[in-house]
């Protein structure tokens, strides 16, 4: 991913070549993989979007495994339950969040979303996870709960719209380049 896809995109499309203009987002299982890849490469991504996969930040239940392009030693963070486990920033993702000020400097947006409808534990757990991140000093985390939707395209369309708007705002621009 990092060694092949980013150079290919930069070669074939008009892009700005720095991390401050690079985002990665994924939905469902792709959201989990996005978390794994971006957290292993916070020097390459400033905007991280986890659509119905935001549960990958922090403790709880989960599946494990590293994504292609991620450091195989990276410890992925499992999904939150309705009451997420305590958050240990020193151990998840090999400590990428251990220094909250440094993480906030590197990652401008950590966006997580779920649908509001059952299983409601996902949305409630995600809200609690964000509270834990903020309490631990991770200030650039954002949660969106899609009203009247579940694990479906409506949630993901709304999530992409919200993530894109937030990312442009956090970059301090009023329009996309």
Language-model region placement:
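Non-catalytic cap/lid and distal C-terminal segments of serine-dependent acyl enzymes
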Residues: 1-177
